[in-house]
Amino acid sequence: MSCPVIELTQQLIRRPSLSPDDAGCQALLIERLQAIGFTVERMDFADTQNFWAWRGQGETLAFAGHTDVVPPGDADRWINPPFEPTIRDGMLFGRGAADMKGSLAAMVVAAERFVAQHPNHTGRLAFLITSDEEASAHNGTVKVVEALMARNERLDYCLVGEPSSIEVVGDVVKNGRRGSLTCNLTIHGVQGHVAYPHLADNPVHRAAPFINELVAIEWDQGNEFFPATSMQIANIQAGTGSNNVIPGELFVQFNFRFSTELTDEMIKEQVLALLEKHQLRYTVDWWLSGQPFLTARGKLVDAVVNAVEHYNEIKPQLLTTGGTSDGRFIARMGAQVVELGPVNATIHKINECVNAADLQLLARMYQRIMEQLVA
């Protein structure tokens, strides 16, 4: 199958860009963008490669994505080596095919076609690309956004190419994401012998009523755009491994995926009040990895919906479900942010794959979005 989008996707897959190693992917993208008149600014931080590229001026539409991928797992379980792209029955296999090298290829090819047809486009077209989205994300998009904000860079619209679709490309568009807040909580007791409990203070016993009450809380009921806030215990650890020692500490890690009905401060206040109610001795550490954001119906959402309806003849669902994405950082710039990408059924899995025809369709959708906003 010969197609510019498929060929570029295959070139990217062949580069084993395990986060945060870019493995030459960005050099390939930069070469293509510079060839059509983009100015490229490399913005590397520590071990992470990033770039910000732009063409034109005025109202700005940026396409954002990441070149890094997660580890492939056991390569012997793949139907072909994970970094050797292979097409079988119309499906393109390879690590990163769906998440998200296919989207990157579709973006670049769409830009090439758009510039060829609109060499004097009235708005500014931009790219924000990082090599660290899948791992810590500490030196990726967030650092680029901070640098752009410090110099008052303009960003009106941003399309993130994360694999948003469920069954066919464009059936789901993400116009927001929930916030994510993690609590690392240590309950302090006194270690001792299980035969002499009066000489110890068991933190597991002390914390049990607190945990029961915590998991029973209905944090909110969500709203028109967001499901109800969810709290899940992710890790819980105590004890020495011996059956005759009362542990001295209990560690509990729990995560909130929260809607716009709550703030992270409201969650913290409620958890701390509950700890005090149960008279626990504790230390606590919070990690806020992202605030919730929502892009309401407007020029970007309308352009994305129009592109999907035009090429796939379906009306996409606008959802805020799922995990976090780099859109949470970009939203800080005041931009309208939407995610549109391929089907996500196999992302991070053995035999990750994407329908090759979907990538061609995605490039056409991306081009139509460009034409509506910055032509």
Swiss-Prot record:
UniProt catalytic activity: N-succinyl-(2S,6S)-2,6-diaminopimelate + H2O = (2S,6S)-2,6-diaminopimelate + succinate
Q: Which family does it belong to?
A: Belongs to the peptidase M20A family. DapE subfamily.
**Free-text comment on the cofactor:** Binds 2 Zn(2+) or Co(2+) ions per subunit.
Under which main EC class is this enzyme filed? hydrolase
Spell out the InterPro entries in the cross-references. ArgE/DapE_CS, Bact_exopeptidase_dim_dom, DapE_proteobac, Peptidase_M20, Peptidase_M20_dimer, Peptidase_M20A
Name the residues annotated as catalytic in the UniProt entry.
68, 133 (proton acceptor)
Please explain the role this protein plays, according to its UniProt record.
Catalyzes the hydrolysis of N-succinyl-L,L-diaminopimelic acid (SDAP), forming succinate and LL-2,6-diaminopimelate (DAP), an intermediate involved in the bacterial biosynthesis of lysine and meso-diaminopimelic acid, an essential component of bacterial cell walls.
Give the record's subunit note: Homodimer.
Pfam families, alphabetized: M20_dimer, Peptidase_M20
State the gene name recorded for this protein: dapE
Q: Which cofactors are named for this entry? A: Zn(2+); Co(2+)
Q: Name one GO biological process term.
A: diaminopimelate biosynthetic process
| EC number in record | 3.5.1.18
What are the alphabetically sorted keywords of the record?
Amino-acid biosynthesis, Cobalt, Diaminopimelate biosynthesis, Hydrolase, Lysine biosynthesis, Metal-binding, Zinc
User: What is this protein called in UniProt?
Assistant: Succinyl-diaminopimelate desuccinylase
Query: Which Gene3D superfamilies does the record match to this protein?
Result: Zn peptidases (3.40.630.10)
What domain of life does the UniProt record list for this protein's source? Bacteria
* Binding annotation for Zn(2+) 2: 99, 134, 348
- What range does the record give for the signal peptide? none
Molecular function terms, GO-annotated = acetylornithine deacetylase activity; cobalt ion binding; succinyl-diaminopimelate desuccinylase activity; zinc ion binding
Q: In which pathway does it act?
A: Amino-acid biosynthesis; L-lysine biosynthesis via DAP pathway; LL-2,6-diaminopimelate from (S)-tetrahydrodipicolinate (succinylase route): step 3/3
Q: Where does Zn(2+) 1 bind?
A: 66, 99, 162
